[in-house]
Curated annotation (Swiss-Prot):
Pfam family, one: tRNA-synt_2e
EC assignment: 6.1.1.14
Protein known as: Glycine--tRNA ligase, chloroplastic/mitochondrial 2
Phenotype upon loss of function: Embryo defective. Developmental arrest of the embryo between the globular and heart stages. Plants with partial loss of EDD1 display changes in patterning of margin and distal regions of leaves.
Residues reported in the UniProt entry to bind substrate: 513, 624-628, 855-859
Gene Ontology BP terms: embryo development ending in seed dormancy; glycyl-tRNA aminoacylation; regulation of embryonic development
Family designation: Belongs to the class-II aminoacyl-tRNA synthetase family.
Length: 1067
């Protein structure tokens, strides 16, 4: 089979020097096969002001891009090989070891490391045991075929090269909805990550496109572009078949005839017969072998052994042996090997002198002063609009919103700081552009008189008051007559000053200097490099800046500004000449681009609602989905699609998550709130609506066929039967399986109910729910759609006749799942959620899995944050250390007291974070947690109230009142257990203070509310003031002195268990 699969004509470009290195990889006629350079080479700037990179390379006479027939599977591989060879790639061979993706082939992982250029393309059969479906699922295979491309360094037009490759496959890119949808890729095994996209065609992911930032835990320079095609998906779409086995592989033979039996037998092995014990040993053997090879200085065979460990792990995972936490441990072992292989490979290539050469960094363009002077000659006196547009490859939706507003604020600050008068300042954003438009901006600055400081007066004038050379120099520098200088004291020194009128500089000159700086200030949650020192959300490909009809000349990220923007990808107007800033909005509108975010939302809602009404339905519009979809498109085109009504028999949550999360579709419901068999997809730009609608329907059908397959597998059993399957899912090597974890939870719940003061009548419900907890982790649906954990547990429990209370608790054990998520509503769900998190925290800390400052592979920060969120929002007072000890008592390994204390401190820091996130000052938080951290609910309530009280009149007074006795007794030998002797009092102030203390001390206790503590403590303010005004504490007579210290010590200790006031301002 392997011979059939890969005995294809190859066009192999050997690595040899060529005379004329080129910047762009451009399609050439297929008879030509350019070679990759072995020499050091230099790339010119990525983009010029003429937007060279936006040229359309689609030539109707070119063999690569003209319309071609639908290819067979074999022809598709041939066409991609020929196309990428024609633009300068060497066509390589697949790995001879099982890999889960083309990324793991040494041609990618090892070759993206280091400075050597590398442009390759190859087919990679990717083995994923977890996707085994016996050939029954139409869209899932344990061995699927990727086509992998690596471009190193980024040529600057890699997106266009990819789109041209689709044309080479025979795809009409003007008819289809081709989109770049955010995908932040990472490989925990390889210590690799990058930013880029899933590339969708009519809603189906056909390719992954990534700018590698790191590999082997090492930063990459230069950055490589990875393009990974999913060939089965693409060919099914092109051949319009609904099952992989129907793909025409070559003339007269189908994919199924070649590979269906392989799918059946390998699925049987991976899912049923693979020996877990032997595979664990294999993993250890391969790991040991890799380390021995690394010690011998052999990175290539060592990496081959790493690939074998990865495949062994994947089979163990498919057998259901790897739990969430154990996964992180295996990943850590493999990541360590990957890092060592990477380091050794780099050292080896360096020792060889980098045989393929060194990729040079681009030289940034220089904004010559002469260019600015030339433009300045054309400046008019009249105010004109100013426009700046930062053109990028597709940014993530949230980045569009945040960055466009940041740019608006930064431009506004620049205008104010530089004294440039202006009208309205508006921000716009689309996936490919950040825009700020300023109305009526003046052509030059306002003049301003400012005070400038010169030399000290003692140096500016001699003893007789005559100006020195220092004064003359200062006068000359600012053009101010000597007699206009004046003296002014600053601090303890007298200086010479002068009033100076700052000249009005041209706006063009000021903007040219300052714009690069403000663009560099735009920040993103995740930024990337693309062979430039600049970090940005995605690569910047053009910059347009105009004041009126004049270009504001500057450079940023290796790009010079100009007056050219870019149109929609799938239109003829790839480049748009903007005549002046005033015409920008019309230019965009006429090209079909809607730059206003709110306007795009409005278009989506209006057209989608109309489409929903056309089928007697109502649109379901989650706000976060609308925000996302509106910023995935520049020209929204809502389309209505239909799916088979039989799919409505699946759980609504399953259908909805596929539509909304996976496909970004809006669902449609009837008047009663039931799903209708329709959806709304939002396409982008000028497309063939029938083609795109048909494609999206096919994609959703495939998704729902997957979901149906998983659901039918699950419903062959009762839900309780999945409980025993948890025995096959490892939680952690030292903590046992998920079944062991569930049993620990069962042991905890009765005592936990008592600690949380839960009604004892609810205990049977909690215990029954605990016996089923987490069972859905063994179901096929949750394995595939992990976000449905808990949701499917509730569904399957209700389906099997369990009570609503039990079913709801099975959902709520997972809550909250993320920041801002809801918390459990029922007490039964709350007990399970708290117990599960306590078990995870104590167990994993005991197993040595504490997070570091930079790494939290088990998500313990999220778990603990959710735990305190539940306790606080459910208003449950609990002795936290006691419930930690309860969790410690059921662990399979001994938990030391210091481990419990470590968990306590760790969770307390999360509580501190939660309170600060909710607006409590850090000082107040620390003061409360120092005394009440063991009861998170009471601590939070105290912190919120203290924050409010601290802004009033009463609370600062008691802070000051308690501060004086505390400071006096601090460090003094007051004596342990020394009691106050009333007979030792010598003054009425002592007696009054003691009397006040004794009247309130029993009313202040560890559970008192802070407002009551404050009100009661106010009774001490006046007696304390009288005491300190009239009584000297540290008298000579020891008996009196110690008695007074004991009195003050008793008062200083009153806040203990309530609040530590020493953390607060004014103490």
């Amino acid at each position: 089979m392997a011979i059939l699969h890969f005995s294809l004509p190859l066009i192999v470009s050997f690595l040899r020097p060529h005379a004329s290195p080129r910047f762009f990889l451009l399609p050439r006629s297929l008879s030509q096969s350019p070679f990759l350079s072995r020499r050091r080479f230099h790339r010119t700037s990525a983009v010029s002001s003429a937007a060279v990179h936006h040229q359309s390379y689609r030539n109707p006479d070119d063999d690569v891009t003209r319309a071609v027939s639908v290819p067979t599977f074999q022809q598709a591989i041939q066409r991609l090989q020929e196309y990428w060879a024609s633009v300068g790639c060497a066509v390589m061979q697949p790995s001879n070891t099982e890999v889960g993706a083309g990324t793991m082939n040494p041609c990618t992982f090892l070759r993206v490391l280091g400075p050597e250029p590398w442009n390759v393309a190859y087919v990679e059969p990717s083995i994923r045991p977890d996707d085994s479906r016996y050939g029954e699922n139409p869209n899932r295979l344990q061995r699927h075929t990727q086509f992998q491309v690596i471009l190193k360094p980024d040529p600057g037009n890699s997106q266009q090269l990819f789109i041209n490759s689709l044309s080479a496959l025979g795809i009409d890119v003007t008819a289809h909805d081709i989109r770049f949808v955010e995908d932040n890729w990472e490989s925990p095994v390889l210590g690799a990550w990058g930013l880029g996209w899933e590339i969708w065609m009519d809603g189906m992911e056909i390719t992954q496109f990534t700018y590698f930032q790191q590999a082997g835990s090492l930063p990459l320079s230069p950055v490589s572009v990875e393009i990974t095609y999913g060939l089965e998906r693409i060919i099914m779409l092109l051949q319009e078949v609904d099952h992989f086995k129907k793909i025409l592989y070559a003339d007269g033979i189908t994919y199924g005839e070649l590979f269906l039996e392989n799918e059946k037998e390998m699925s049987s092995y991976y899912l049923e017969h693979a020996s877990v014990d032997r595979l664990q040993k294999h993993f250890d053997y391969f790991d040991e072998e890799a380390r021995s090879l690394l010690a011998l200085g052999l990175p290539i065979p060592a990496y081959d052994q790493l690939l074998k460990t990865s495949h062994a792990f994947n089979i163990l995972d498919a057998r259901g042996f790897i739990g969430v936490t154990e996964r992180a441990r295996y990943f850590g072992r493999m990541r360590s090997l990957a890092r060592q292989c990477a380091q050794l490979w780099l050292a080896t290539r360096e020792s060889l002198g980098h045989p393929l050469g060194v990729a040079s960094e681009p030289v940034p363009p220089v904004c010559h002063r002469a260019a600015l002077e030339k433009v300045a000659e054309k400046v008019s006196e009249d105010p004109r609009s100013f426009i700046i547009e930062i053109g990028t490859e597709e940014m993530p939706p949230q980045d569009v919103i945040n960055a466009s507003e940041q740019l608006r604020v930064l431009v506004l600050e620049l205008l104010e700081n530089q004294r440039l008068r202006h009208g309205a300042v508006k921000a716009f954003g689309t996936p490919r552009r950040l825009v700020v438009l300023v109305d009526a901006m003046s052509s030059k600055q306002l003049e301003e008189e400012v005070e400038v400081r010169g030399p000290p007066a003692s140096k500016a004038f001699d003893d007789e008051g005559n100006p020195t050379k220092a004064a003359e120099g200062f006068s000359r520098r600012y053009g101010v007559p000597l007699e206009k200088l004046y003296r002014k004291v600053s601090g303890k020194t007298e200086y010479v000053h002068a009033r100076v009128t700052e000249p009005a500089r041209l706006a063009l000159e000021v903007l040219s200097e300052d714009l690069p700086g403000i663009l560099a200030k735009i920040s993103f949650p995740k930024s990337m490099r693309w062979n430039s020192s600049v970090m940005f959300s995605r690569p910047i490909r053009w910059v347009m800046a105009l004041h009126g009809d004049l270009v504001v000349p500057f450079s940023f990220a290796g790009i010079s500004s100009g007056n050219v923007s870019c149109g929609l990808r799938n239109t003829a107007s790839a480049s748009l000449l903007v005549q002046n800033a005033e015409s920008y909005e019309d230019t965009m509108r006429n090209s079909g681009i809607n730059i206003e975010i709110e306007e795009r939302k409005k278009i989506i809602l209006e057209k989608s609602n109309a489409l929903a009404k056309s089928v007697s339905g109502r649109l379901v519009v989650p706000q976060n989905l609308l925000n996302e979809v509106a910023n995935l498109v520049e020209a929204p085109v809502p389309l209505i699609g239909k799916f088979k009504e039989s799919f409505l028999e699946l759980p609504e949550e399953l259908l909805t998550i596929v539509m909304q999360k996976h496909q970004k579709y809006f669902s449609i419901i009837d008047e009663s709130g039931q799903l209708l068999p329709y959806f709304i997809a939002v396409a982008n730009g000028a497309i063939n609506e029938d083609v795109v609608k048909k494609g999206n329907e096919a994609v959703l059908r495939a998704r729902y066929e997957d979901a149906k397959f998983f659901y039918e597998v699950d419903t062959r059993k009762r839900f309780s039967e999945f409980r025993d399957q948890l025995q096959g899912i490892l939680f952690h090597e030292k903590l046992g399986t998920m079944l062991d974890k569930m049993n620990r939870l069962k042991k905890m719940v009765s005592k936990l109910c008592l600690a949380l003061k839960i009604d004892e009548d609810l205990l049977p419900v909690v215990e029954d729910a605990a016996s089923l907890a987490m069972s859905d982790l063994a179901t096929a649906v949750v394995t595939e759609f992990t976000a449905l954990s808990g949701i499917m547990a509730r569904h399957y429990a209700l389906r099997d006749g369990y009570s609503e209370q039990i079913a709801e608790a099975l959902l709520e054990i997972t809550l909250p799942r993320f920041s801002g998520d809801v918390i459990p509503k029922t007490d039964a769900g709350m007990v399970l959620a708290i117990g599960d998190r306590l078990d995870s925290l104590v167990g994993l800390f005991a197993a040595g899995c504490q997070p570091s400052s930079t790494n939290d592979p088990f998500g313990l920060r999220r778990i603990s944050y959710g735990l305190v969120q539940i306790l606080v929002e459910k208003d449950k007072n609990v002795n936290f250390k006691r419930v930690l000890e309860l969790a410690a008592s059921v662990q399979p390994t001994k938990v030391e007291a210091n481990t419990v204390e470590d968990v306590y401190q760790f969770v307390t820091r999360r509580l501190e974070q939660l309170l600060v996130d909710n607006g409590v000052s850090p000082e107040v938080v620390r003061s409360v947690l120092a005394e009440r951290g063991n009861n998170p609910c009471l601590a939070a309530r105290t912190a919120y109230k203290t924050e409010k009280l601290s802004k009033g009149e009463m609370f600062p007074k008691i802070v000051e009142a308690y501060s004086r006795p505390t400071r006096i007794v601090r460090g003094k030998d007051v004596g342990v257990g020394v009691e106050v002797d009333e007979n030792a009092f010598e003054t009425p102030q002592e007696r009054t203070l003691w009397s006040t203390y004794t009247s309130i001390k029993d009313r202040i206790h560890t559970g008192i509310e802070i407002e009551d503590f404050t009100e009661i403590s106010m009774q001490l303010v006046e007696p304390l003031e009288d005491f300190f005004n009239n009584v000297f504490v540290m008298v000579e007579e020891e008996r009196v002195r110690k008695n007074r210290l004991a009195l003050l010590n008793n008062i200083a200790n009153l806040p203990k268990g309530v609040i530590d006031l020493s953390f607060l301002p004014g103490f």
